[in-house]
Amino acid sequence: MLSDTIDTKQQQQQLHVLFIDSYDSFTYNVVRLIEQQTDISPGVNAVHVTTVHSDTFQSMDQLLPLLPLFDAIVVGPGPGNPNNGAQDMGIISELFENANGKLDEVPILGICLGFQAMCLAQGADVSELNTIKHGQVYEMHLNDAARACGLFSGYPDTFKSTRYHSLHVNAEGIDTLLPLCTTEDENGILLMSAQTKNKPWFGVQYHPESCCSELGGLLVSNFLKLSFINNVKTGRWEKKKLNGEFSDILSRLDRTIDRDPIYKVKEKYPKGEDTTYVKQFEVSEDPKLTFEICNIIREEKFVMSSSVISENTGEWSIIALPNSASQVFTHYGAMKKTTVHYWQDSEISYTLLKKCLDGQDSDLPGSLEVIHEDKSQFWITLGKFMENKIIDNHREIPFIGGLVGILGYEIGQYIACGRCNDDENSLVPDAKLVFINNSIVINHKQGKLYCISLDNTFPVALEQSLRDSFVRKKNIKQSLSWPKYLPEEIDFIITMPDKLDYAKAFKKCQDYMHKGDSYEMCLTTQTKVVPSAVIEPWRIFQTLVQRNPAPFSSFFEFKDIIPRQDETPPVLCFLSTSPERFLKWDADTCELRPIKGTVKKGPQMNLAKATRILKTPKEFGENLMILDLIRNDLYELVPDVRVEEFMSVQEYATVYQLVSVVKAHGLTSASKKTRYSGIDVLKHSLPPGSMTGAPKKITVQLLQDKIESKLNKHVNGGARGVYSGVTGYWSVNSNGDWSVNIRCMYSYNGGTSWQLGAGGAITVLSTLDGELEEMYNKLESNLQIFM
């Protein structure tokens, strides 16, 4: 597989393919499609793919000595324009310039950007389409040359494939290119595939790896068979060097992209039965039960609850109870530091914490540790802490104890960490997680409540209160005794994004997509709410869940430092009514549920009408792009990825939305030398694709540096902070569940001011008015409680 060490004997039965990636978000969909081909030739029934970035090699002089290792090269899709040469494509432009004829016998397949680069090197024109196609499925038409060349062997005359391209190739009059396939739309007849004459170089403009493309595996299989036949005829197959030295080179190349697990996953874990306390009771199945329980809890609590129960979402609620044995992990990305300390350690004050972080005091108080590390190392810190706490116990319960908390948007890949607050003197975390020993877990579908402790310290008085109030009482109050409105005497100053600034940001997104830099850009805004007096966060949460019920409601108020009389700690508060699961996992599988496409509910809008709207080309393409992106994120680590639900329309309290379900199987497969856990998938998948667009790397960088820094200057200077990140848990029984931080509000100052994010995916089919309406609809779901 991608990261496995190569056995020399096994190499002799494999084709070796070099895949050149231009930091695209569909790369591993192609890689896995290549690896899945097994029927290549008698005695050759497997493919090993070595993936490198387009800038891994600085010149062809570095790559040429390695070519005897590879039977073929695949140049993948990516952002940018091939006319910009190495600036956008790295070594790819030099590759197709043929290195003075040294690649004439090397089979090459170019996909999308790779296809354009191949054609450009032959003198073809690559220019912008009048009407761009991103995430749209079209019919492809083969010609006689396609049937003769072998690349499309076994194909019908026409088939459907997904298009993601802003640019197109005009090869008219180019004698060295042999057209193979075309499509037709309002742009006219467009070239979709070609071969460079007298060379084993092929290319396709469409994306064979997309989940909506037909016969993609057959195309790749045909290319691999052609490569093998070519190499036998030219002698490359016999010349391929397979000694130990070259095995080491292949293995080193495989490691140029970091896919090491965060911690070493064991085959077996202890049961932990001696210390784990689990007490089960029968209770009401009503989802309001969670909130009624919260009414009697006097201890500090974090709540991950559901107000809406549906199949596989909202079935469970969790109340986590931090105490003095709970360790708190906080990462400050801009400082490149992580703090670790026990919950409400009496020796730690905010003033001392800030001095230690600023380097003014090297004498660390109490349990405080300050670790100098960047955000990539922060994951290792979490892994080292958790790896000896994992137990094989009660895996049927989603959470029995472990880390709970928030991972902000900037903790994800490709994003620069920056200060996310107006107050330059405050400390703003990019991630905050607390280890929980004691918790209350409720199964709403089965009417079961669990009191759980990892160290046998569950509060006796609380358990007795739960017994007295809720056990075997199948009916609770018909209506929750929580207020639906905030106090009337409180006024709010609301600062919303400027419409003119939004229009400028929308225009920039369109410009970047038309240039080929992105397929889809998730443009987000920030709104600031300042109350005339501080309202307790729990009081706001009570109103929020009443007004906007959702399957992934969350309440986090991090009072992990006890304030001194002269201090006002910058308490992070997070209140969410998110409809979207990001990632759920158990010991061997993980699931993502991307949501894209939104229609507001109203008297004139029903499910049937919303379904028609959400299945239009714009909404379909928006969802398909994220679906293919998520498949890519999973395929990077796991070979078995399946789309188990494809774009179903689901109903929520205020909107209808388009939802898909993607699952990966085999995280800890014994056949693999590298065993992963769900936390590895989480790290490699952040930030959530539904909140970025694609390709992820260049898109998030453009959004952060060129667009949102100006659009949201009234709040965060462009940083999203908590919004667009994820909230959830990593349980010691190898389960995890994280929701996307949308339909949420958050405060870095204990409720003195609140921030609300809202946005939507911009595609070339988007309209300014349509996106503004969608953004305001999403914003209104939570902003309504302040109005």
Swiss-Prot record:
UniProt-annotated location(s): Cytoplasm
Keywords (A to Z) from UniProt: Cytoplasm, Folate biosynthesis, Glutamine amidotransferase, Multifunctional enzyme, Transferase
Pathway annotation from the record: Cofactor biosynthesis; tetrahydrofolate biosynthesis; 4-aminobenzoate from chorismate: step 1/2
Major site of localization recorded for this protein: cytoplasm
Domain of life the protein comes from: Eukaryota
PROSITE patterns, sorted: GATASE_TYPE_1
Stretches the record annotates as PABB component: 304-787
Entry's family note: In the C-terminal section; belongs to the anthranilate synthase component I family.
NCBIfam families assigned: PabB-fungal, trpG_papA
Annotated protein name in UniProt: Aminodeoxychorismate synthase
Organism field: Saccharomyces cerevisiae (strain ATCC 204508 / S288c)
Organism taxonomic ancestry: Eukaryota, Fungi, Dikarya, Ascomycota, Saccharomycotina
Gene: ABZ1
